[in-house]
Amino acid sequence: MIRIAIPTGRMLEQTLDFLRNFDKKLLDEEKGRKLRIRGERFEVFLAKPWDLPLYVEERVVDLGIIGRDVILEQERNLVNLLSLPFGYCKMVIAGYPHISLEKNGKEIKIATKYENIARKFLEDKWSKIKVIKLNGSVELGPILNISDFIVDIVETGKTLKENGLEIKEVLFESSACLVSNVASFVYLRDEILSFVKEVRKLNDKCN
């Protein structure tokens, strides 16, 4: 049986619906407050999105389903098997309409919970940046005048508009990804590759 961690939060229902295509017994399980759901093929663990990559890397589980944004931010030693057809969002720079992205020689302040992504994508864009880590609503950065822009994921952009902000630039598009750790990929190679093949077939049908 393959142990797989899936994220709580916005992608939970989509992820469970996706896995039920490959393990019908998961349909019989009521989630409730359970953090572990046992199917016929998978043993599923519900984890906080930011903890999930650690569980995969440390081989607590064999596979994980997590957003590309978290993978790029944490830079853990994972085997990225393939992208999945849900969990779509965009990583963007956003700010007030009247503030331009043009270089002006000043230090640019960025509010974000994605510190590594902000530095990776923006240090080449601006010579001087200051990344301000926020764990809550990053839209407060410009509102409270502690940052010029924010870097964050958006799905519809509704929250940005409600707070008077607009997308300045899309850094990359993100979706859910299926990942493994090196050890599990070696020892469960046949099972994992068989599952990946089934996922690809389902993806082809959906496209």
Swiss-Prot record:
It catalyses: 1-(5-phospho-beta-D-ribosyl)-ATP + diphosphate = 5-phospho-alpha-D-ribose 1-diphosphate + ATP. GO terms for biological process: L-histidine biosynthetic process. Signal peptide: none annotated. Pathway: Amino-acid biosynthesis; L-histidine biosynthesis; L-histidine from 5-phospho-alpha-D-ribose 1-diphosphate: step 1/9. GO terms for cellular component: cytoplasm. Its main location: cytoplasm. It is found in: Cytoplasm. SUPFAM superfamilies: Periplasmic binding protein-like II (SSF53850). InterPro entries: ATP_PRibTrfase_cat (IPR013820), ATP_PRibTrfase_CS (IPR018198), ATP_PRibTrfase_HisG (IPR001348), ATP_PRibTrfase_HisG_short (IPR024893). Keywords: Amino-acid biosynthesis, ATP-binding, Cytoplasm, Glycosyltransferase, Histidine biosynthesis, Nucleotide-binding, Transferase. Its EC number is 2.4.2.17. Lacks the C-terminal regulatory region which is replaced by HisZ. Belongs to the ATP phosphoribosyltransferase family. Short subfamily. Heteromultimer composed of HisG and HisZ subunits. This is ATP phosphoribosyltransferase. It comes from Dictyoglomus thermophilum (strain ATCC 35947 / DSM 3960 / H-6-12). The gene is hisG.
